[in-house]
UniProtKB/Swiss-Prot annotation:
Pfam families: 7tm_1. The chain crosses the membrane at residues 19-39, 62-82, 115-135. Belongs to the G-protein coupled receptor 1 family. Keywords: Cell membrane, G-protein coupled receptor, Membrane, Receptor, Transducer, Transmembrane, Transmembrane helix. High affinity receptor for melatonin. Likely to mediate the reproductive and circadian actions of melatonin. The activity of this receptor is mediated by pertussis toxin sensitive G proteins that inhibit adenylate cyclase activity. Possibly involved in sleep induction, by melatonin activation of the potassium channel KCNMA1/BK and the dissociation of G-beta and G-gamma subunits, thereby decreasing synaptic transmission. It is found in: Cell membrane. This is Melatonin receptor type 1A. It comes from Rattus norvegicus. InterPro entries: GPCR_Rhodpsn, GPCR_Rhodpsn_7TM, Mel_1A/1B_rcpt, Melatonin_rcpt. GO terms for molecular function: hormone binding; melatonin receptor activity. One of its GO terms (cellular component) is neuronal cell body. At least in the brain, more precisely in the pars tuberalis and the suprachiasmatic nucleus.
Length: 156
């Protein structure tokens, strides 16, 4: 990231590399959708008026999906933010002013803004993923016990 590796940022995120990253993200997205087509977990859900992932079709697949598409990314992003925060604290506590480049106020504001976006993203997606884990634990028993309003609210 820019805050931790500001000298390498321009090289890592050049226009050419950024296009490669976008292509990679779209490719990984298409690959991630393929198992849904194999397991039959994409179905129309009249509660949300949309074709969506059906959590009760396969418990193992639902758990894997939640772990690899929500839990692991949250852990990675949290680790990265912890590294950034440690750097921010080190820069603020530094006694020698010229030993390393200082953190600019704009960089700190950008960090806080990105962190707030991350927290809001996690808060928005957590209910749906936790409901998925609950349903996956015992689909026949738990799926009917999830209130419909809670399920619908977790999508929005």
């Amino acid at each position: 990231c820019y805050i931790c590796h500001s000298l390498k940022y321009d090289r890592i995120y050049s226009n050419k590399n950024s296009l490669c990253y976008v292509f990679l993200i779209w490719t990984l997205t298409l690959i991630a959708i393929m198992p849904n087509l194999q397991t039959g977990t994409l179905q129309y859900d009249p509660r949300i008026y949309s074709c969506t992932f059906t959590q009760s079709v396969s418990s193992a697949y639902t758990i894997a999906l939640v772990v690899f598409h929500f839990v692991v990314p949250m852990i990675i992003v949290t680790f990265c933010y912890l590294r950034i925060w440690i750097l921010v604290l080190q820069v603020r506590r530094r006694v020698k002013p010229d030993s390393k480049p200082k953190l600019k106020p704009q960089d700190f504001r950008n960090f806080v803004t990105m962190f707030v976006v991350f927290v809001l993203f996690a808060l928005c997606w957590a209910p749906l993923n936790f409901i998925g884990l609950i349903v996956a634990s015992d689909p026949a028993t738990m799926a009917p016990r999830i209130p419909e309003w809670l399920f619908v609210a977790s999508y929005y």
